[in-house]
From Swiss-Prot:
It is found in: Cytoplasm. Peptide chain release factor 1 directs the termination of translation in response to the peptide chain termination codons UAG and UAA. Belongs to the prokaryotic/mitochondrial release factor family. Pfam families: PCRF, RF-1. It comes from Gluconacetobacter diazotrophicus (strain ATCC 49037 / DSM 5601 / CCUG 37298 / CIP 103539 / LMG 7603 / PAl5). Methylated by PrmC. Methylation increases the termination efficiency of RF1. This is Peptide chain release factor 1. Its main location: cytoplasm. Keywords: Cytoplasm, Methylation, Protein biosynthesis. The modification N5-methylglutamine is found at Q229.
Length: 352
């Protein structure tokens, strides 16, 4: 089926839903029809723009035969022939299956991997880079856990980033980030390679994840600071274990046990929700015989080479020589390119 046939079907379906809603559907039938109509409406609006532009193109084409109108018609045709492909591509993208998590806020988790102290230092810098990115996008960045190492690095950093479309922008950051540079403690000037892992999870709610109290083991203990010394005489730290999956979340950032428990539950729910999403995604990918998405988290996704001032995203072979600006939070060039790459893969998979 060609694109135009699909567009005609979408318009017909929208008109069918509009008529059904006008007839007075009630209950779940009304809710279901309303949701589908709301999803189709913006696509139908774009189709209307396309059809109008195509009509104007035909009219301008006809005017070419008139010597007095030829110059004006040629100018209009040039504009329309540039605009129509853009409209058609916009419609193709609007027709792609939507990830309902894209509009959600997100949980960001960063941990050092290989490289010891240098990995911990870069983890702290990357955590701060995402904080700056959130500020540039107008999002709220709330630190949920910041476990600092003795040298000022980061053992574990978790943040709740709140705003519209946060997950859609940050989901491509999940994976292994590699840093290449000369550590401050390196006397021979040798470049060291270290790695940091980043996980970005869509924020989940009670509707998304059902957790039975009997599935949880909750332990409380005294919070400890750098080097293991106790910094709180009360048992304010909380560790929650989800027994069916073995997932464990520990939280000690707050002085209040209640606040630490609430934060730990928020992270646990996000991790459980992501497990469900990953399982569903794997099933869909197997059905299509191809992996469509943001890549395996176990793979290296990006390299930050400080001596060369270079940042390279290995998934799309994009290199930018502006490492200082990237570390100041300017990730949009990479996010935009990754978004376009994913859209291209989805368009191919959907036959659009």
């Amino acid at each position: 089926m060609g694109l135009d046939d699909r567009l005609d079907r979408i318009v017909a379906r929208s008109e069918e839903l509009q008529a059904a809603l006008a007839e007075g559907l009630v209950g779940e039938a009304f809710a279901k029809a309303s949701r589908e109509y709301a999803e189709l409406e913006p696509i139908v609006d774009r189709i209307g723009e396309l059809r109008l532009a195509e009509q104007e193109e035909r009219q301008s084409q006809a005017l070419l035969a008139d010597p007095e109108m030829r110059e004006l018609a040629e100018a209009e045709l040039e504009d329309l022939r540039a605009r129509i492909p853009v409209l058609r591509q916009d419609i193709r993208i609007a027709m792609l299956p939507r990830d309902e998590a894209d509009e959600r806020s997100a949980i960001l988790e960063i941990r050092p991997a290989a490289g010891g102290d240098e990995a911990a230092l870069f983890a702290a810098e990357l955590f701060d880079a995402y904080r700056r990115y959130a500020a540039l996008r107008g999002w709220r960045f709330e630190i949920m856990e910041f476990d600092e190492s003795e040298l000022g690095g980061l053992r574990e950093g978790i943040a709740n980033i709140t705003g519209r479309g946060v997950f859609a922008r940050l989901k491509y950051e999940s994976g292994v980030h590699r840093v290449q540079r000369v550590p401050a403690t390196e006397s021979q000037g040798r470049i060291h390679t270290s790695t940091v892992t980043v996980a970005v999870l869509p924020e989940a709610g009670d509707v998304d994840v059902q957790i039975n109290d009997g599935d949880l083991r909750i332990d409380v203990y005294r919070a400890s600071g750098a080097g293991g010394q106790h910094v709180n005489k009360t048992e304010s730290a909380v560790r929650i274990t989800h027994l069916p999956t073995g997932l464990v979340v520990a939280m000690q950032e707050e002085k209040s046990q209640h606040k630490n428990r609430a934060k730990a539950m928020k992270i646990l729910m996000a991790r459980l929700y992501e497990r469900e999403r990953a399982a569903a995604h794997a099933t869909r990918a197997a059905d299509r015989k191809s992996q469509v998405g943001t890549g395996d988290r176990s793979e290296r996704i990006r390299t930050y080479n400080f001596p060369q001032g270079r940042v390279t995203d290995h998934r799309i072979n994009l290199t930018a020589y502006k490492i200082d600006r990237v570390m100041m939070g300017e990730f949009d060039e990479f996010v935009d390119a990754l978004t376009q790459d994913e859209q291209a893969s989805l368009l191919a998979a959907e036959g659009l």
